[in-house]
């Protein structure tokens, strides 16, 4: 058992723009975060992950960076950031920030130089190609829809942008680019931050030749992930990144590893040779797609997570999560945010949280915050949502249907303001919020839930305390039980003589639990989300909709 401080943390993700506004301009800021640090400490948080607060024109909410060493005015100043770092450390917590190094903003000085002429010294810092006649260099589709190429009239060439056109991709084959990035990374680490969550890092290597995608359907642009996501040769860049930066400091690093399978994860998170301490994998998120009437596949979900648990056992470490700033709210997608909001928020929380790995909570998840239903596309801010909506309208879909699709798929679902109280704008701001507050804020907020012992918030406090209370829930071996059950996700965590059994019915119907190998007693029940009658030596019983239980067996 290889103990590390970062394996024992409880982490919390903050989306600064929506967390807390301190000056009434309707935008969350650094001083607002400082004002809520005691809330996070009381919750049981050890590590804060801060989404981008760098200088940015904000075409993609800060993931388009124009200056890596300065703070966006609406968030505050570098002095504010230094104060935040100090206040976090004063409370015994740690702070990591987003590191966005696949691309910059089109307003970054590097790109301004690069686009100025074909013979500029920084031309090769980005990826430029001539078009094919009047068309783009290839048929790749941007992750944010449309072409992945944008024409620059000044130099009459196209530049590659896997995300928005305002986010040109850096050329990682250029050593000068890599060296400048390493200097910037070490500058932040010398400032005293405790690490990074590294954004879109699996996209930094592009397939040689930038060839067209196969296009049997005759599409204008084709989804191109296989040409730029975890492609052959990326390990060279990852190894150098670690050697030049991370390995010199006692920090924690989390890679956003889209496209990395459990079988390939060794290169990314192996204890000694991996680039990162842990990674965010997205296989479990890919199980959900918007289709009317499509239910949540419990068995597929537990199969994916169990595969990751087993593949990294004794080799690497998992970063556990069910929500972040890029996906809709879990209770509204996988669960039932109407009849069983509280129950399913607790059930999904318990099942992921007590697996082996470092759990991350996204702001508002601990309250059971839900998706939002705006009345018009004009109320949305997310560039991906707006682009997708416009594409759907152009394809002949009605405005009503396109808007309903946005209700369930938009990234803005997780970016609505944090719900602190029942007062105006959920206590987030005394001004006009930059994006609309969810209408259910008077029922779902910190103030209300702190007073309710059965709230989702107080359940998360118990969950955090439980995770920290026994090493078996941190370092213990994970074993799935009831493998073929299509409704119940259940597993054990075992270390020496300590053993826990965690179970949840992840459906809105009753589910029969049957497992003869463990006889369960009510005296050993340590966490639950329904009232449970006294029982002794039970091996079968009924779990109510979204019921979860945790037993300490020994």
Which residue ranges define each predicted feature?
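Acidic/aromatic-lined carbohydrate-recognition and catalytic surfaces
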Residues: 2-186, 190, 203-261, 271, ...
């Amino acid at each position: 058992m290889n103990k590390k401080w970062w394996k024992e943390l409880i982490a919390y993700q903050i989306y600064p723009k929506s967390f807390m506004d301190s000056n009434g301009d309707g935008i969350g800021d650094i001083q607002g975060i400082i004002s809520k640090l005691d809330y996070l400490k009381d919750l049981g948080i050890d590590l804060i992950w801060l989404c981008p607060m760098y200088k940015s024109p904000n075409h993609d909410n800060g993931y388009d960076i124009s200056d890596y060493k300065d703070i966006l005015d609406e968030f505050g100043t570098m002095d504010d950031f230094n104060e935040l770092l100090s206040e976090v450390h004063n409370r015994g917590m740690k702070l990591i920030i987003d590191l966005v190094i696949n691309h910059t903003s089109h307003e970054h000085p590097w790109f301004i130089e690069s686009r100025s002429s074909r013979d500029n010294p920084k031309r090769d810092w980005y990826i430029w190609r001539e078009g094919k006649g009047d068309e783009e260099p290839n048929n790749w589709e941007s992750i944010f829809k449309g072409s992945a190429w944008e024409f620059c009239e000044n130099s009459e060439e196209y530049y590659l942008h896997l995300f928005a056109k305002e986010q040109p991709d850096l050329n990682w084959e250029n050593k000068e680019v890599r060296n400048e990035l390493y200097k910037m990374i070490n500058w932040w680490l010398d400032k005293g931050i405790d690490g990074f969550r590294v954004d879109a890092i699996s996209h930094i290597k592009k397939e040689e030749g930038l060839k067209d995608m196969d296009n049997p359907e005759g599409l204008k642009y084709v989804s191109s992930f296989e040409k730029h996501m975890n492609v052959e040769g990326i390990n060279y860049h990852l190894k150098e990144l670690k050697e030049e930066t991370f390995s010199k400091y006692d920090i924690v690093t989390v890679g956003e590893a889209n496209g990395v399978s459990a079988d390939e994860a060794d290169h990314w998170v192996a204890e000694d040779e991996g680039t990162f301490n842990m990674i965010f994998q997205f296989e479990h998120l890919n199980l959900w797609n918007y289709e009317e009437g499509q239910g949540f596949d419990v068995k597929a979900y537990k199969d994916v997570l169990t595969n990751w648990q087993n593949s990294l056992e004794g080799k690497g470490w998992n970063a556990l999560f069910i929500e972040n700033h890029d996906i809709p709210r879990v209770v509204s997608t996988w669960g039932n945010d109407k009849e069983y909001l509280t129950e399913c928020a607790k059930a999904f929380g318990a099942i992921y949280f007590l697996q082996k790995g470092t759990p991350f909570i996204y702001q508002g998840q601990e309250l059971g915050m839900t998706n939002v239903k705006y009345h018009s596309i004009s109320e949305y801010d997310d560039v991906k949502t707006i682009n997708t909506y416009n594409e759907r309208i152009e394809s002949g879909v009605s405005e009503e249907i396109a808007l309903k699709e946005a209700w369930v798929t938009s990234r803005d679902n997780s970016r609505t303001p944090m719900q602190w109280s029942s007062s105006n704008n959920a206590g987030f701001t005394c001004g006009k919020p930059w994006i609309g507050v969810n209408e259910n804020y008077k029922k779902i907020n910190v103030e209300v839930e702190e007073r309710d012992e059965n709230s989702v918030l107080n359940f998360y406090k118990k969950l955090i305390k439980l995770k920290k209370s026994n090493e078996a829930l941190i370092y213990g071996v994970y074993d799935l039980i009831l493998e073929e059950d299509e409704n119940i996700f259940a597993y054990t965590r075992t270390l020496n003589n300590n053993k826990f059994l965690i179970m949840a019915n992840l459906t809105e119907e009753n589910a029969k639990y049957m497992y003869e190998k463990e006889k369960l007693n009510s005296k050993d029940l340590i966490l639950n989300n329904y009232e449970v009658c006294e029982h002794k030596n039970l091996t079968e019983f009924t779990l109510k909709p979204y019921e979860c239980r945790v037993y300490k067996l020994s």
